[in-house]
Amino acid sequence: MKEKVVLAYSGGLDTSIIIPWLKENYDLDVIAVCVNVGQGDDMDYVKTKAIKSGASKIYVEDVKEEFVVDYLYKAIKSEALYEQDYMLGTSFARPLMAKKLVEIAHKEQAKYICHGCTGKGNDQVRFEVGVKAQDPTIKIIAPWRIWDIKSREDAIDYAKKVGVEVPVTKKKIYSVDKNLWHVSHEGGDLEDLKNEHKEDMYFMVTPPEKAKDEPTYLEIYFEKGAPVKINGEVLNPVDIIDKLNTIGGENGIGIADIIENRLVGMKSRGIYETPAGTLLYAAHKKLESVTLDKYTYQYKKIVSAQYGELVYNGLWFTSLREAIDAFVDKTQENVTGTVQLKLYKGNIKPCSVDTEYALYDEGISSFGESELYSHKDAEGFINLFGLPSKIKALKNF
């Protein structure tokens, strides 16, 4: 009986040719696993294609709701970003995929897990560290670090040789990753920084100059930091993301052209579409500015950056990530209320906040006198606050 390998399968170029390559070079029984995080593929087609390509079995795991509730809601609550720009759409999906791969490897008693990540990318780290954190006995096969195929053009040639159909041509050769949260585009002419990216690549977003000519007003209600209602309507978590992707997309919201520092050392360029995430982060940030005290708000910004770096670097299965989640959950206890946004041709303008947990007090913040604050109090405060500066000036160093 042949030993088994569980393959992270998408039906795309890389994983399509890996099936015959594994059989040819390792003589393994290939169990394909497609983790459905909302990439929008025809799963019946994916199943058929995996079997036609030589897999003995195909699992399709629909984890969209788990992805939103257990991963994306953590992103929203923490407002995690990598290098202040990247909303981590790929990064948040990978630990969930690794979790499912290990579960099926255990179920199938497979000794190997295989992925189609390149040897220059971050995903190889995310998958492999995620697998090792759950079961260090499982062996990893990473074809892009082993085989003679050196480019995506080579991969297309190999696909033709072994008779595997792939939805990519040499002329239009972007690497695309798609899920509920985002679409990323890399490779091809994007690798030359002198090239403006082409707007016809967009899947989710209308180019801002072609977006609606009238502004859209949007209300998002959060409960303890998590979105619950859109325009007053309670929706399930997946529908919330879908609806906001539609609203944001038709208003030209959510495009980012980013140069990022990869974990493996080099810089890379990616075009990201994240309409729902962009709207949710903007609304959540506004609500936090009203409901969090000064020091919690400022410290959380530091923690958010650390959280984004952890997730980007594939360190989901760590005690630090769990500890940050616990801190973030504490900060979200009063992050409940409604934020109204005005959307117009790629721009977001926060309009209003309605929350019973506001730390903003109009009576205190106005220029008039109040029982809690007297203008005369400012003089003593300024003297004490400025004392270090005054002492230094007197010393005349």
From Swiss-Prot:
Gene3D superfamilies: Argininosuccinate synthetase, chain A, domain 2 (3.90.1260.10), HUPs (3.40.50.620), Single helix bin (1.20.5.470). InterPro entries: Arginosuc_syn_C, Arginosuc_syn_N, Arginosuc_synth, Arginosuc_synth_CS, Arginosuc_synth_type_1_subfam, AS_cat/multimer_dom_body, Rossmann-like_a/b/a_fold. It is an enzyme of class 6 (ligase). L-citrulline binds at residues 86, 91, 122, 126, 175, 184, 260, 272. The keyword Amino-acid biosynthesis applies. GO terms for biological process: argininosuccinate metabolic process; L-arginine biosynthetic process; urea cycle. It catalyses: L-citrulline + L-aspartate + ATP = 2-(N(omega)-L-arginino)succinate + AMP + diphosphate + H(+). Pathway: Amino-acid biosynthesis; L-arginine biosynthesis; L-arginine from L-ornithine and carbamoyl phosphate: step 2/3. Belongs to the argininosuccinate synthase family. Type 1 subfamily. Homotetramer. This is Argininosuccinate synthase. The lineage of its organism: Bacteria, Bacillati, Bacillota, Clostridia, Eubacteriales.
